[in-house]
């Protein structure tokens, strides 16, 4: 029970992104895109505190746009299976989802997530995944066959092509 901020604190954005990366259908509950910090009454009419420029609005828009545009993240047989990437750090979750489509080309999503409240360093074996990617943050990133990432607490990197 409680809001996502009460339950997850600073990890709420990471776990929102996680639900978009793993197979299945991500759920957005009433008030999440507004950054609602108010517990809604159960089975009662309640008011949502809407924050116009809530950071969650941009977060969920970016995640929704990514999921719509990249076929690897689609649900069921239309999407791609999730494959864990071998990491040398148990606090970091890393995976790839790849989907080839003759009509729409190759779709690849790499996710690297620090699942802890401490800074983490991880080296990943990205053999066969090397190349230039778009980062969800809006920048381009070159991925090497073996690459080390420095991640602040609850930080995630989502790379696509």
Name every feature range the model reports, one short phrase each:
Residues 16:
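Conserved glycine-rich, hydrophobic/aromatic-active-site segments
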Residues 8-9, 13, 23-28, 32-161:
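Carbohydrate-interacting/catalytic domains
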Residues 1-6:
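Active-site clefts of carbohydrate-active enzymes
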């Amino acid at each position: 029970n409680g809001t996502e901020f009460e339950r997850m604190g600073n990890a709420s954005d990471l776990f929102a992104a996680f639900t978009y990366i793993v197979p299945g259908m991500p759920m957005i509950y009433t008030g999440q895109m507004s950054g609602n910090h108010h517990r809604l009454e159960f089975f009662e009419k309640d008011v949502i505190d809407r924050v116009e420029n809530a950071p969650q609005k941009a977060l969920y828009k970016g995640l929704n746009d990514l999921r719509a545009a990249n076929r690897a993240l689609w649900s069921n047989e239309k999407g791609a299976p999730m494959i864990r990437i071998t990491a040398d750090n148990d606090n970091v979750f890393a995976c790839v989802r790849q989907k080839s489509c003759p009509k729409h080309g190759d779709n690849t999503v790499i996710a690297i997530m620090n699942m802890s409240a401490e800074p983490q360093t991880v080296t990943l074996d990205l053999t066969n995944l090397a190349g230039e990617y778009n980062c969800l943050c809006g920048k381009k990133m070159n991925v090497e066959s073996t690459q080390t990432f420095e991640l602040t607490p609850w930080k995630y990197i989502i790379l696509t092509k």
